[in-house]
Amino acid sequence: AEIDFSGIPEDIIKQI
């Protein structure tokens, strides 16, 4: 997914 700190990307959250 595209990295958007404005709403926090779900893909990044799942990786964490």
Curated annotation (Swiss-Prot):
Q: Does the keyword Phosphoprotein apply?
A: no
Q: Report the subcellular localization.
A: Secreted
Query: Which terms does the UniProt entry file under GO BP?
Result: killing of cells of another organism
Q: Which domain of life is it from?
A: Eukaryota
Key words, A-Z: Cytolysis, Secreted
User: Which GO cellular component terms, listed alphabetically, does the Swiss-Prot or TrEMBL entry include?
Assistant: extracellular region
Let me know which tissues express this protein, per UniProt: Expressed by the venom gland.
Tell me what else is known.
Answer: The primary structure of this cryptide Pep-1 is identical to that of cryptide TyPep-1 from Tityus serrulatus (AC P84189).
Described purpose of this protein according to its UniProt entry: May act to induce hypotension. Presents moderate hemolytic activity at physiological concentrations (micromolar range). Does not induce mast cell degranulation, lactate dehydrogenase (LDH) release from mast cells and antimicrobial effects. In vivo, injection into mice causes an increase in nociceptive sensibility, but causes very reduced or no edema formation. It also reduces mice locomotion, suggesting an increase in anxiety, but causes no alteration in rearing (standing on hind limbs).
Question: Under which name does UniProt file this protein?
Answer: Cryptide Pep-1
- Organism whose genome encodes this protein: Tityus obscurus (Amazonian scorpion)
